[in-house]
């Protein structure tokens, strides 16, 4: 059995761009609620977008790209909050 066919790179980037335009504000708002910092939320959401640009060409478009981006951004936010808490404990 062969692996599923991956979409061509241009089509994939158009799909990523489309999902990002639709979901970016929602992702940033969710992460901003977690971090209480809109600027940091924008950075973390963009980190999730970069991760998609790195992973999706190899792995293919996930079944629910919006959920993938949201989950990745939330995980980045959790990592950030943990690092921030650790830094505060050290000082």
State where each predicted segment sits.
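Sigma70-family region 2
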Residues: 47-65, 83-85
